[in-house]
Amino acid sequence: MDYKTSGVDIEAGREFVSEIKQAVEATHTSNVIEGIGGFGGLFRIPIDSFKKPVLVSGTDGVGTKLELAQSKNFHFEVGIDLVAMCMNDIITSGARPLFFLDYIATGKLDKKQLLRVVQGISHGCGENNCSLLGGETAEMPGFYSKNKYDLAGFCVGIVDEDKLINGKKVSENDLIIALKSNGVHSNGFSLVRKIIQNNNQIDKEFEKVSHLNFYDELLKPTKIYNNVINQMLSEDIEIKAMSHITGGGIPENLPRCIPSDFIPYINTSSWQIPTLFKFLKEKGSIPERDFWNTFNLGVGFCLIIDKQFKDAILSICKDYGIDSWEIGKIVRKNDSTISKFLPEILT
């Protein structure tokens, strides 16, 4: 018995690397010394642009969205999701992404499927001037089923230590600006999949309500906010804190980026929750608290700023085609008039 008979096709793996090479190398900046094919990717750190350069790293996956996306052939889109989940995390520190690495594990290498995944990863990187420096594709028969794959991503960025955004400058009455999400993004899909299992006509019912394709809306790739944030920082707009709204929703993620003696007060009437979320809530009979603590509800990213920068930020977001609005403000925890986060729903 040889290795191929056991389920691992070394030759197919070599062919796959050859097929993805063009997509990967299209993302390479002048700082890439050596990328795909070697034992390690080599990247020249652009330290001349920084007084005290700090590297910022992040790693993430796409979660159980992969299960649904694979069943509906949304392979390119989950590649973008992978980049977004990592990149949106590191930019909250004010970092500029430098390079990205991916890990793909599968039961049996399907070159056509996984080429689309890598093309999606390359697209996400290329749109944000981030080099796809390398990765690993592991064929693991018996561990993963034949037609399934899992993804993990790793993003590294750079920021000047003096320009780190860490929430320490947040103060009372600072404004919270919301940037609209692209949909469900990559969180809450264990619940979504359960709702779908219990409603076998859910796609047709959604189309009656919205006149939109259910799976096209549900599986839209996660929005990447890097370019619009970079534009703000390049115009010397002071952002005191940022939050990527992922698992746990606004209630879990927004407080993470501010000092413990403050709380974010959110005006829940400042935006309309998108139809898709309300539809899922109804079909799944989701309790209000779980609804807010599971989904982003149309808010993908939040900024905390001094009010003097509000108009400039809203204008830049408009230029980048991103809806944005003032969603709330920062208050002290001991403020007797506002004692709870999202008081309308969490009492």
From Swiss-Prot:
Gene3D superfamilies cross-referenced by the UniProt entry: PurM-like C-terminal domain, PurM-like, N-terminal domain
Keyword Cytoplasm: yes
Coiled coil location: none
Matches recorded under Pfam families: AIRS, AIRS_C
Pathway(s) annotated for this protein in UniProt: Purine metabolism; IMP biosynthesis via de novo pathway; 5-amino-1-(5-phospho-D-ribosyl)imidazole from N(2)-formyl-N(1)-(5-phospho-D-ribosyl)glycinamide: step 2/2
EC identifiers of the protein: 6.3.3.1
UniProt subcellular location: Cytoplasm
Cross-referenced CDD domains: PurM (cd02196)
Catalysed reaction, written as an equation: 2-formamido-N(1)-(5-O-phospho-beta-D-ribosyl)acetamidine + ATP = 5-amino-1-(5-phospho-beta-D-ribosyl)imidazole + ADP + phosphate + H(+)
Top-level taxon of the source organism: Bacteria
Any one GO molecular-function label of the UniProt entry: ATP binding
GO biological process terms, semicolon-separated: 'de novo' IMP biosynthetic process; adenine biosynthetic process
Keywords tagged on the record: ATP-binding, Cytoplasm, Ligase, Nucleotide-binding, Purine biosynthesis
SUPFAM superfamilies in UniProt: PurM C-terminal domain-like, PurM N-terminal domain-like
InterPro entries, alphabetized: PurM-like_C_dom, PurM-like_C_sf, PurM-like_N, PurM-like_N_sf, PurM_cligase
Record's GO cellular component terms: cytosol
Record HAMAP family: AIRS (MF_00741)
Family: Belongs to the AIR synthase family.
Protein name as catalogued: Phosphoribosylformylglycinamidine cyclo-ligase
Gene: purM
